Amino acid sequence: MNLERVSNEEKLNLCRKYYLGGFAFLPFLWLVNIFWFFREAFIVPAYTEQSQIKGYVWRSAVGFFLWVIVLSTWITIFQIYRPRWGALGDYLSFTIPLGTP
């Protein structure tokens, strides 16, 4: 979709949908929202809906980076401590590596 051919109200509506969709445990939508609407929010000349789009883009960026931090922390903890958790670590694993930890 070419955003230049879409009305400003439709841009705002689409940006809002991507922002709200990110709350359904889909942080990739926030990343798409950031890349797709960054130009509309911060570079193009000002228009009425731009301030709302800017807010959605900023909040999408914050949400996405919080997801990255939480997911990176969980992956690091799981990789380091999984063998110590015994049966629980094995239960949470999709594949169980061979050998000793």
UniProtKB/Swiss-Prot annotation:
It comes from the Eukaryota. It is found in: Endoplasmic reticulum membrane; Golgi apparatus, Golgi stack membrane; Cell membrane; Membrane. The keyword Transit peptide does not apply. The keyword ATP-binding does not apply. Residues 18-36 dip into the membrane without crossing it. GO terms for cellular component: endoplasmic reticulum membrane; gamma-secretase complex; Golgi cisterna membrane; membrane. Disulfide bonds: none annotated. Keywords: Cell membrane, Endoplasmic reticulum, Golgi apparatus, Membrane, Notch signaling pathway, Transmembrane, Transmembrane helix. Signal peptide: none annotated. Its main location: endoplasmic reticulum. Residues 79-101 are lumenal. Residues 1-17, 37-57 are cytoplasmic. The chain crosses the membrane at residues 58-78. It is a multi-pass membrane protein. InterPro entries: Gamma_Secretase_Asp_P_PEN2 (IPR019379). GO terms for biological process: amyloid precursor protein metabolic process; amyloid-beta formation; Notch receptor processing; Notch signaling pathway. The functional gamma-secretase complex is composed of at least four polypeptides: a presenilin homodimer (PSEN1 or PSEN2), nicastrin (NCSTN), APH1 (APH1A or APH1B) and PSENEN. Essential subunit of the gamma-secretase complex, an endoprotease complex that catalyzes the intramembrane cleavage of integral membrane proteins such as Notch receptors and APP (amyloid-beta precursor protein). The gamma-secretase complex plays a role in Notch and Wnt signaling cascades and regulation of downstream processes via its role in processing key regulatory proteins, and by regulating cytosolic CTNNB1 levels. PSENEN modulates both endoproteolysis of presenilin and gamma-secretase activity. Belongs to the PEN-2 family. This is Gamma-secretase subunit PEN-2. It comes from Bos taurus (Bovine).
